[in-house]
């Protein structure tokens, strides 16, 4: 069950997807991330390629992308590896854009879309050979239930790869408040992700600290949006452009000061 704050976040996502698919925003995304999906995660093309290798997927594999948004990186992973793909998300607006993208690119792989919460996946147990999600858990309150649901639908001894932004343990009260202000809306967690993964029956194969590359990505995004500010103002309210710059500056500073981190996990089901 979604909290009221999560419901409000979902409503705002429709506005975000519309904004992210404006031509100038797609141009910025291509320059910074190497893709143009109007993505809601911070996954670059190079990181998506790494995810494909870590998942070990190929033709005949069934991949589940949870919280897939407009289809990045799931559609790209399916296109480059030949695996069959299922995209899951709420609300529907991002999935509609993913469907349009898939229709436009018309690949030979099978792609299914499901409107569902990550904590209540509508699939039978042991349905998938691989699971991925990109910066999803830091945008949800109930992180543990999502990890449990992914465990149930993944086949035994298969892998899940995901990225997540988190707040390091042991911060002072003032630094913790700064981290919450700079991170995604639900970045806070009572437990570390290593603990959450252990609690939900996952074995951690790799935990890659990708904070420095995320810091560089944030700086690149900030610089690129600043350089396109005049173009952005032609299609966007000045207050929105100003707020995005402030948010990027706040996140960059929090990352540089060690108040946020980003990890890429490779985990295996224990069942």
Predicted regions located by residue number:
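N-terminal, positively charged/glycine-rich alpha-helical extensions of SAM-dependent methyltransferases
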Residues: 1-32
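Conserved alpha-helix/loop element of class I SAM-dependent methyltransferases that forms part
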Residues: 41-59
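Class I SAM-dependent methyltransferase SAM/SAH-binding core
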Residues: 62-120
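A short acidic, Gly/Pro-enriched loop at the edge of an enzyme's catalytic core
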Residues: 119-131
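A short SAM/SAH-binding and catalytic strip from SAM-dependent methyltransferases
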Residues: 130-142
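A short glycine-rich, Lys/Arg-flanked "PGG" loop and its adjoining helix->strand segment in the class I
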Residues: 144-159
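Short, glycine-/aromatic-enriched active-site segment of Class I SAM-dependent methyltransferases
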Residues: 162-185
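Conserved Class I S-adenosyl-L-methionine
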Residues: 206-271
């Amino acid at each position: 069950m979604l909290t009221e704050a999560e419901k409000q976040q979902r409503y705002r996502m429709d506005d975000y997807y519309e904004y992210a698919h404006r031509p100038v925003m797609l141009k910025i995304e291509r320059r910074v991330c190497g893709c143009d999906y109007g993505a809601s995660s911070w996954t670059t093309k190079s990181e998506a390629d790494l995810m494909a290798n870590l998942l070990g997927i190929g033709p005949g594999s069934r991949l589940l992308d949870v919280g897939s948004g407009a289809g990045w990186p799931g559609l790209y992973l399916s296109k480059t590896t030949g695996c069959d793909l299922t995209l899951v998300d709420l609300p529907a607006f991002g999935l509609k854009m993913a469907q349009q993208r898939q229709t436009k690119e018309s690949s030979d792989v099978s792609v299914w879309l499901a409107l569902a919460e990550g904590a209540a996946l509508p699939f039978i147990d042991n349905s998938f050979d691989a699971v991925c999600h990109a910066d999803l858990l830091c945008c949800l309150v109930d992180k543990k239930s999502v990890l449990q649901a992914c465990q149930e639908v993944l086949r035994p001894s298969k892998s899940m790869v995901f990225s997540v932004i988190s707040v390091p343990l042991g911060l002072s009260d003032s630094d913790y408040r700064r981290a919450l202000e700079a991170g995604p809306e639900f970045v806070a967690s009572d437990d570390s992700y290593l603990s959450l993964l252990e609690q939900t029956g996952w074995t951690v194969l790799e935990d890659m600290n990708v904070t420095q590359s995320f810091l560089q990505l944030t700086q690149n995004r900030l610089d690129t949006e600043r350089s396109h500010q005049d173009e952005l103002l032609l299609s966007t309210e000045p207050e929105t452009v100003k707020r995005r710059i402030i948010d990027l500056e706040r996140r960059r500073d929090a990352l540089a000061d060690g108040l946020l981190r980003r990890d890429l996990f490779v985990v295996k089901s224990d069942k």
